[in-house]
């Protein structure tokens, strides 16, 4: 059986919610894009738990602890690899692995090789998001001087 093919990284920012506030529309989008990168690649249940924790901490720091906790709880439920969604854990891989969903799994050597080819583009997109998220903060600081 041929190895599944990893699709190039795509992100919709904060799936099913706002990327920021009305006056700062991308305030925590970098948190979501980082989480999307993890979700795209998938992996073990422990890796997912750690990734979900990171998005909660990131949004807590970018916005408010209550929002971070809320997002973490929602990605824990909604990002299951067993939901056939565009934002599930491992969404870069085909949903089906034979007759069962892909679910949680350690990447094979072949899958890791595919990922290594595509990760630089995913990292570049993430760096772009981080830069965009920091820009309004730097502009506001300059305005206050």
Regions found by a protein language model. Give the residues of each.
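Extended terminal accessory/targeting regions
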Residues: 1-145
């Amino acid at each position: 059986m041929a190895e599944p093919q990893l699709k190039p990284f795509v992100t919709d920012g904060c799936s099913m919610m706002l990327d920021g506030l009305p006056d700062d529309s991308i305030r925590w989008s970098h948190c979501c894009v980082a989480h999307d990168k993890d979700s795209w690649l998938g992996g073990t249940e422990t890796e997912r738990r750690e990734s979900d924790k990171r998005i909660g901490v990131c949004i807590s720091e970018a916005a408010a602890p209550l929002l971070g906790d809320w997002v973490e709880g929602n990605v824990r439920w909604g990002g299951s690899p067993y939901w056939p969604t565009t934002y599930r854990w491992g969404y870069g891989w085909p949903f089906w692995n034979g007759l069962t969903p892909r679910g949680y799994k350690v990447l094979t050597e072949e899958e890791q090789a595919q990922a290594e080819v595509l990760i630089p583009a995913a990292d570049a997109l993430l760096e772009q998001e981080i830069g965009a998220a920091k820009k309004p903060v730097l502009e506001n600081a300059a305005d206050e001087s």
